[in-house]
Design a protein with these regions (language model features):
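Feature marks short, highly hydrophobic, charge-poor N-terminal signal-anchor/signal peptide-like helices
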Residues: 1-15
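Intrinsically disordered, low-complexity segments used for protein-protein interactions
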Residues: 3-6, 199-200, 206-210
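Single-pass alpha-helical transmembrane signal-anchor segments
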Residues: 11-29
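N-terminal topogenic membrane-targeting module
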Residues: 27-104
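Generic alpha-helical secondary structure
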Residues: 35-38, 204, 208
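Residues that form generic nucleotide/phosphate-binding pockets
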Residues: 45-48, 171, 214, 218
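Structured extramembrane domains adjacent to transmembrane segments
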Residues: 76-206
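Short amphipathic C-terminal alpha-helix that caps PH/PH-like domains
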Residues: 207-222
Length: 222
């Protein structure tokens, strides 16, 4: 018993207890912050896309969630939206700094299923994100490219015709702030639009609404 009494009076023991308490506090605080983020993001997505049915799935404990939004309205230009959000491990105080170096930020991937294909391929691709993520555009050799500044970020504008170029530039002119958007891809072959963005709580709807309003003008027979 005397040996145990000596241990619990050592400064290192109190440091251990204090560190354990900090880790516990960080765990619950981090989980709460991640929950607030994904709930806010999914609420914004539902508000924009107005699905008739929806399914939410946990894919990574406190850091990953997936949503399937089904749209059955006849006049809608979308039939489905798949969304995946992966977040920094805010609940893990020890791993969070490493994750920030490796992953840098939270991520929201959107896959929009179009009822009719886009008239042609087009991209907004932020240069720093493209280098970091090593994003590759499959038909890059068939597309023209130019660099534009969008809200202080350098983006590659990729297009196959002057008509598509003008549509992309018109969108930029009407929406000077990309928010968290780092890539928008219109892919006729897959009849889809892909969007990657860095999600912020209570900002996803504001960022995505202009894109949602713009897409029907790019889809055939709409």
């Amino acid at each position: 018993m005397h040996e145990y009494e000596q241990i619990i009076t050592q400064p290192i023991f109190f440091l251990f207890v204090a560190f354990s308490l900090v880790l516990t506090w960080a765990y619950f605080r981090g989980k709460r912050r991640n929950r607030e983020l994904y709930v806010s993001v999914f609420e914004d997505l539902v508000r924009i896309f107005k699905p008739d049915d929806q399914k939410f799935t946990n894919i990574g404990g406190a850091i990953g969630y997936h949503a399937n939004l089904y749209i059955r309205k006849k006049k809608a230009f979308l039939s489905r939206v798949d969304a995946t959000i992966t977040m920094l491990p805010r609940h893990s105080l020890l791993y969070l700094p490493i994750s920030k170096l490796i992953r840098k930020y939270d991520r929201l991937f959107l896959e929009l299923y179009l009822k009719n294909p886009p008239s042609e391929e087009g991209h907004f691709l932020e240069k720093r994100y493209a280098r970091f993520s090593k994003t590759r555009v499959a038909n890059l050799d068939k597309l023209e490219a130019e660099t534009v500044n969008w809200g202080g970020y350098d983006f590659d504008l990729l297009y196959g015709s002057e008509q598509m170029r003008q549509k992309l530039l018109d969108f930029l002119a009407k929406n000077p702030d990309p928010g968290g958007i780092r890539h928008i891809a219109l892919v006729p072959e897959q009849q889809k639009c892909f969007i990657f963005m860095i999600p912020k709580k209570k900002e996803v709807a504001t960022t995505l609404q202009p894109v949602y309003n713009w897409l029907p003008s790019l889809v055939k027979n709409m």
